């Protein structure tokens, strides 16, 4: 399987590293407008190939992406300290107006995985610019937020986070929604998991999830490692046809009477991209929060100068 990464910044290279050590692809092309930096990053990466299963990795132009099964887009303006993901939108839309049509010339049959922020808006923009079926364009969405949620809950409950079922849906950003009503371990609801469990912890955990990116950016300038691992998981689901349930961002199709936007819901991800959406039964409060998140995204989309 062949993949391409567009953008050799911290996120793009974290994705490349994660996929290399997990033997996700047979071939990986990485492209960036800064050729010297790109070549340095690729040199550093390929020198580690003797330690893992062989993968062909090389620095290429957009034309070299031809034949890719999946194209991972991480290119775009960097989020500044204190800047929301939605503040980025107008700068990144201008980049995508030329990037997506150029990619479509070379790999129209690829699955497009958007990671650039604000990821929900940029996924929608990519879908409209590419003119592809909805399932063929998806975003990393709240895969990372869901992982953060599970990690923090698992820390409090003393369990392996992989054994905990919990989801963050909606926008990958300030209006994201924690689906508390569905948090469980082996079918046991969160309220029954521990006699010491304090409901006051709930808001504290969610605030940590929602503010995690801001805290990391304030301390080190960018997030990279965890999103790299999350993207590798999505790509594995795509190229290995795992039909894995992941909270990726994709076009709404009438779920919960939401407006037309791209946002995250639990979705089955396989070789064809997003194969279907799993509509959870939400509480009235969760449904209202999800609608608020969708309308915030719709307002941003409506402000775009196409």
From Swiss-Prot:
List the coiled-coil residues.
none
Q: Which InterPro entries does the UniProt record give?
A: L-lactate/malate_DH, L-lactate_DH, L-lactate_DH_AS, Lactate/malate_DH_C, Lactate/malate_DH_N, Lactate_DH/Glyco_Ohase_4_C, NAD(P)-bd_dom_sf
Which GO terms fall under biological process for this protein? glycolytic process; lactate metabolic process
Ligand binding (NAD(+))? 11, 32, 37, 76-77, 98, 115-117, 140
Which residue positions does Phosphotyrosine occur at? 214
Subcellular compartments:
Cytoplasm
Molecular functions (GO terms): L-lactate dehydrogenase activity
User: What are the disulphide bonds in this sequence?
Assistant: none
Residues reported to bind beta-D-fructose 1,6-bisphosphate:
150, 165
Q: Does the keyword Zinc-finger apply?
A: no
Catalytic residues at 172
Mechanisms controlling activity: Allosterically activated by fructose 1,6-bisphosphate (FBP).
The yes or no answer to whether the keyword Oxidoreductase is present is yes
The Enzyme Commission number assigned here is: 1.1.1.27
Residues engaged in binding substrate:
79, 85, 117-120, 145-148, 223
- Reactions mediated catalytically: (S)-lactate + NAD(+) = pyruvate + NADH + H(+)
Instruction: Give the CC-aspect GO terms.
Output: cytoplasm
Annotated PROSITE patterns: L_LDH (PS00064)
Annotated pathway:
Fermentation; pyruvate fermentation to lactate; (S)-lactate from pyruvate: step 1/1
Q: What does this protein do?
A: Catalyzes the conversion of lactate to pyruvate.
Family per record: Belongs to the LDH/MDH superfamily. LDH family.
UniProt protein name: L-lactate dehydrogenase
Q: In the UniProt record, what gene is named as encoding this protein?
A: ldh
